Curated annotation (Swiss-Prot):
Belongs to the phosphohexose mutase family. It catalyses: alpha-D-glucose 1-phosphate = alpha-D-glucose 6-phosphate; O-phospho-L-seryl-[protein] + alpha-D-glucose 1-phosphate = alpha-D-glucose 1,6-bisphosphate + L-seryl-[protein]; alpha-D-glucose 1,6-bisphosphate + L-seryl-[protein] = O-phospho-L-seryl-[protein] + alpha-D-glucose 6-phosphate. Autophosphorylated. It comes from Zea mays (Maize). This is Phosphoglucomutase, cytoplasmic 1. It is found in: Cytoplasm. Its EC number is 5.4.2.2. GO terms for molecular function: magnesium ion binding; phosphoglucomutase activity. Pfam families: PGM1_C_vert_fung, PGM_PMM_I, PGM_PMM_II, PGM_PMM_III. InterPro entries: A-D-PHexomutase_a/b/a-I, A-D-PHexomutase_a/b/a-I/II/III, A-D-PHexomutase_a/b/a-II, A-D-PHexomutase_a/b/a-III, A-D-PHexomutase_C_sf, A-D-PHexomutase_CS, Alpha-D-phosphohexomutase_SF, PGM. Induction: Repressed in O(2) deprivated (hypoxia/anoxia) conditions. The active site is at S124 (phosphoserine intermediate). The lineage of its organism: Eukaryota, Viridiplantae, Streptophyta, Embryophyta, Tracheophyta.
Length: 583
């Protein structure tokens, strides 16, 4: 094959190419504008140390959403022009975000090469399709998202960019076929290695979990199982892991064929969007006579999030991470020698705090964004972490990992039933959660999401909540006028985090109202939507009395919900009488 050449293309900056907590997310039509994607990719190459680009190996893959295949070809041509030596691509451009992290950390090429980073093409749980969302983010050599020092540099570069490099005469690579395609350029050879990433990922999972113990559970006639990939990239792993490795019936897989538009659905694993799974698990509105499975789980578009369900029972993500942490040492071989520490994002309930205190574990509360966990893990300070937004993970990689969370839960259920598979009744998901509440108390918890709110109105609402914090006596007067049956507000602030590893400070990470009985109200503007603003309200109440841990969550939280919505003047500012999603 002849030499490919390098072309310098003149360009001008686009406004708003600032990567949020999980990269740059915009509508597909925005990314399809001439030079838009190219500007961001070149700005990223220019922000990285030279040795992480020239002669390096990078991964380019994602959740398979619409525009991914075009983007892979564009980025590959730009990588060649910028002196990258090898590009690793998941077959059909498919690679889950956790698998990308695992590949960066674990995979060794046939020539001994290791990846220094990755362009991940995903907008996670946002919808896909020609008129929906696309996203791109860069992960570093530790397998985790680029830190703010790098993303700030990328954004700065996008504001001044005047040219980018591309090898337009490099042919498109057939990414549907596994194998290495080699080219020659001005600086020597350039290879594109298309591979099935599920092989590397499964190999890693087998070093963490006891697959034989899980298989005994999944093949027991008493245990029934259902996994919903919501037509996201998790489907590319589900059959290999749950059916071929662990013996589940193929009929237990729902929506496990990855689709560019996620089947027209919203690939967000919650009670609103995972409708089919929710119905099957007996939590829907229709009354079916079919007995639900014992265990159900769902993934989002890029397979880093998870939802865990029992028969007619929802496990909150905040409870999920606490229960995994409480049971990890005895249930999961990877943690047999103990946990280094645990961490949660600030809006996540304090259920994990109580476990950490009881088990005498190091505990960290961090801002929203997985990179904060990554720092702690790189420093050997944290083993298990989670966030209320359906993200759970451990230090095996530097991303949250939806399939890992499912395998963790299956490991716990298998351990609790190891002497019981021949008995009359299994210890169920609900049993495990209720046992946990009896031991540690229950954190009643809910989240209200107001999506696509006018950005100006959202900012005004948040500013008002901050200004009110200057006088707690005034706040308490208002609170008592709204509801006399809630505790007193004892502290209120904007959450600020000083990273114990690198000393960096993250300000304005959410507005908190803390009550004397351990209850909390938290308000945040989310950075992951592509249009308008999303206001998230987190409402939490701690109940230590085990005789009171069985109440309906929304009933238990009704007084605090009333306070949250009236104190913030939610309807007044947003015009919304109800949230878009309640979790």
């Amino acid at each position: 094959m002849g030499l490919f050449t390098v072309t310098k293309k003149a360009t001008t900056p686009f406004d708003g190419q600032k990567p949020g907590t999980s990269g740059l997310r915009k509508k597909v039509t925005v990314f399809q504008q001439p030079h838009y994607l190219q500007n961001f990719v070149q700005s990223t190459f220019n922000a990285l140390p030279v040795d992480q680009v020239r002669g390096a190996t990078i991964v380019v893959s994602g959740d398979g959403r619409y525009f991914s295949k075009d983007a892979v070809q564009i980025i590959t041509k730009m990588a060649a022009a910028n002196g990258v030596r090898r590009v690793w691509v998941g077959q059909n451009s498919l690679m889950s975000t956790p698998a990308v992290s695992a590949v960066i950390r674990e995979r060794v090429g046939a020539d001994g090469s290791k990846a220094t980073g990755a362009f991940i093409l995903t907008a996670s749980h946002n919808p896909g399709g020609p008129k929906e969302d696309f996203g791109i983010k860069y992960n570093m050599g530790n397998g985790g998202p680029a830190p703010e020092s790098v993303t700030d540099k990328i954004f700065s570069n996008t504001t001044t960019i005047s040219e980018y490099l591309i090898s337009e005469d490099l042919p498109d690579v057939d990414i549907s076929v596994v194998g290495v395609t080699s080219f020659s350029g001005p600086e020597g050879p350039f290879d594109v290695d298309v591979f099935d990433s599920s092989v590397d990922y499964i190999k890693l999972m087998k070093t963490i979990f006891d697959f034989e113990a899980i298989k005994k559970l999944l093949t027991s006639p008493k245990f029934t199982f259902c996994y919903d990939a919501l037509h996201g990239v998790a489907g590319a792993y589900a059959k290999h892991i749950f059916v071929e490795e662990l013996g589940a019936d193929e009929s237990s897989l729902l929506n496990c064929v990855p689709k560019e538009d996620f089947g027209g659905g919203h690939p967000d694993p919650n009670l609103t969007y995972a409708k089919e799974l929710v119905e099957r698990m007996g939590l829907g509105k229709s009354s079916s006579n079919v007995e639900p499975p014992e265990f159900g789980a769902a993934a989002d578009g890029d397979a880093d999030r998870n939802m865990i369900l029992g028969k007619r029972f929802f496990v909150t993500p905040s409870d999920s991470v606490a229960i995994i942490a409480a049971n990890a040492v005895q249930s999961i071989p990877y943690f047999a020698s103990g946990l280094k520490g645990v961490a949660r994002s600030m809006p996540t309930s304090a259920a994990l705090d109580v476990v950490a205190k009881n088990l005498n574990l190091k505990f960290f509360e961090v801002p929203t964004g997985w990179k904060f966990f990554g720092n702690l893990m790189d420093a050997g300070m944290c083993s298990i972490c989670g966030e209320e937004s359906f993200g759970t993970g451990s230090d095996h990689i530097r991303e949250k990992d939806g399939i890992w969370a499912v395998l963790a839960w299956l490991s716990i259920i298998a351990f609790k039933n190891k002497d019981n598979l021949g008995g009359d009744k299994l210890v169920t998901v609900e049993d495990i959660v209720r046992q946990h509440w009896a031991t540690y108390g229950r954190h009643y918890y809910t989240r209200y999401d107001y999506e696509n709110v006018d950005a100006g109105a959202a900012k005004e609402l948040m500013a008002n909540l901050v200004s009110m914090q200057s006088s707690l006596s005034d706040v308490n007067k208002l609170v008592k006028e709204i509801r006399s049956d809630v505790s007193e507000v004892v502290a209120a602030d904007e959450f600020e985090y000083k990273d114990p590893v690198d000393g960096s400070v993250s300000k304005h990470q959410g507005i908190r109202y803390l009550f004397g009985d351990g209850s909390r109200l938290v308000f945040r503007l989310s950075g992951t939507g592509s249009v308008g603003a999303t206001i998230r309200v987190y409402i939490e109440q701690y109940e230590r009395d085990s005789s009171k841990t069985g109440r309906d969550s929304q009933d238990a939280l009704a007084p605090l919900v009333d306070v949250a919505l009236k104190l913030s003047k939610m309807q007044e500012y947003t015009g919304r009488s109800a949230p878009t999603v309640i979790t």
